[in-house]
Amino acid sequence: NARRTLEQLHSFCRAGSPIRISGIPSFIHDLLGHLKESGPVVLPPQSYLLTGGGWKAADDKKVPREFFREEASRLLGIPPERIRDGYGMAEHSAPYLECRRHRFHVPAYNRVLVRDPVSLRVLPPGEAGMLELITPFNAMMPTLAVLSTDLGLLDPDPCPCGWRSPTFTLVGRGGLSKHKGCAITASEIVKKG
């Protein structure tokens, strides 16, 4: 219910404590649409917006990430560096989060390889290919390594945020047909009402 969500958001803003908003981008995009109609809010200092899960079934509404950040910053009153995205998948059990410079950092215990889609050879930093995600995070599962259909590249230069871990950039999806991941369920539930 958009009206109740906006009322609650205004109530949180009046309370003055930092707010954490988390959700899939299409749901947040819908919220921003309501804020365009009703007027922007100013979230308290130290507030964050964290998205994750991709656009899935709402791919027809997808906007460029930079535009999304600019709109969210303007309508929520928080700086773009406090608007972050998360990347991950149910099969992998380890999240990758953007820093304030909007680069996905690889946690110390993980590895990310970029593989050529045809030969599967490991590509050097700066070359795009399929992302292979490796983690010992859940040794009880047989998915210590997952070769995704997501296309990305390891960034060749250190991140200007100051964190020293490697970073990667998503550049698209591989394959000829769209993969429906676990986040699709939330969107399907909302569409069914």
Across the structure, where does each feature detected by a protein language model lie?
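Active-site glycine/GP-rich loop and adjacent strand/helix microenvironment
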Residues: N1-G193
